[in-house]
Amino acid sequence: MTIGLSCNALKYGGGLERYAIDLARGLADAGVRPLVFARSFDSSVPEYQCVEPRRINVSFLPGKCRDAWFSWRLRAARRAAPVDVLIGCNRVDSSDIAICGGTHLGFLDAIGRMPTFSDRRQIALERRQYARARFVVAHSMLMRDELRRFYGLSDDKIRVLFPPVDAARFTPVDAVRRAELRTRFGFADDEVVLLFPSSSHERKGLPLIEAILRDAGPRVVVAVAGRPPERTSERLRYVGYVKDIEDGYRAADFTILASKYEPFGLVGVESVMCGTPVILPSNIGCCDAIAPSAKLVFAPGDAAGLRGMLDEAVRRVRAGAVRVESGAAARAAIQYDPSVARHVAQLLDLAAEAASDRRNGGR
C-alpha cells in the first residue's frame, strides 16, 4: 500500500507543519516511505530523507489562490504517483484521510467575524475535503463537535485522535537542573512565573492576561516566549524565541493561555509532560486530554474566573504543591498515549480500511 501525505511544507514549524514532520518520521519508523506532496521542502531536516518528495509549485500565484491551485494539482499528482491512500494535512479535496486540526467556520464563530469572499473560498474547499474523505481525523473533541455542527458530518466518518507529542523531548527535570534553567531565563527564586508561549498574542489571549496581571500579587511574572509583545514591564517579560521550549516549560511554575480559539493546543500537553501544570480556558481542545490535577480551567474570556485561577496558582506555588519531577507521574497526567508510534499505527489502520473500501468500489 502506497501512502501519500499532503502538507503545506515539510519543515520544522508549528501546527500542522510540525504534525506532518511527526508523521513522516513515524511512518519511516513503521517501515513506510510516504510520498509527500508539499509547496516547499527543507532538505536539511532529517525527515526529508524518510520521504519521496513531490513539490507542487504555488509561488507564482497570489496568496489567496494557492490553496485551491494546490488542491487541484494534487488530484493529478496522486493519480500519477500512484497513491493508494492520501492523508491530507492541509486543505485538499482528494484526501482519503482528512486531518482536522482546526476548522475555518469554527475559527470565525469563535472570534465573531463574518466570512469574507476569501473566507468563503476556504470554507468551500474544506466542505469538499470533508465530504470526499473516507475518514476525517479530529484532533480534539472540540474539532469533532465543530465537524458535526458546522459541516454536518456523521459520527461514522469522524475519528478522534489526539495529536502526538515527543515523549523523549518533553520530560521533567530534577530540582538542580530546574534551578539552572530559572537562572538562565532570569527568573528569581521567589517569583511565580507563568510561561506564555505564543506567536499570535491577540488570539492567545495576552490582553486578558495583561489586565489580570495588574491585580496579581507581588512577584508574579508572565514570561512571553515567541513573538515579542508590544510592550514589556517588570511583570510582563520577553524571554525571546525559545527553540528548546521544553526548557521554558521546566523553568516556569505554570504555563498559561487565554485563547479565543485553540483547536487542540499542544502547548498544554507539552507543558504537563515537562512537569509544569497549566492555566487554560475551557475552550482549548487539549483540556480533555489533561488530568484535573495538572490544570486550572476558567471560562473563555472570563476575567474574574482567570483571576481566581491565578490566585489559586500562586497559592499552590507558595505551598510547594505544583512541580512534578517524576516522568511517570507527568505522563500519567496525560489521558491518552501521546507517542508518535501509537498515533501512526492508528492512522495506518484507517488507511488499510480506506484502501479496502476503494478496492471494493467505495470512496
UniProtKB/Swiss-Prot annotation:
InterPro entries: Glyco_trans_1, Glyco_trans_4-like_N. Keywords: Glycosyltransferase, Transferase. Its EC number is 2.4.-.-. Pfam families: Glyco_transf_4, Glycos_transf_1. It is an enzyme of class 2 (transferase). One of its GO terms (molecular function) is glycosyltransferase activity. Disruption phenotype: Disruption confers resistance to cellular contact-dependent growth inhibition (CDI) CdiA-2 of B.pseudomallei strain 1026b, but not to endogenous CdiA. Alters lipopolysaccharide structure, decreased binding to B.pseudomallei strain 1026b inhibitor cells. It comes from the Bacteria. Probably a transglycosylase. Probably involved in synthesis of the outer membrane receptor for a cellular contact-dependent growth inhibition (CDI) system. Belongs to the glycosyltransferase group 1 family. Glycosyltransferase 4 subfamily. This is Probable transglycosylase BTH_I0986. The lineage of its organism: Bacteria, Pseudomonadati, Pseudomonadota, Betaproteobacteria, Burkholderiales.
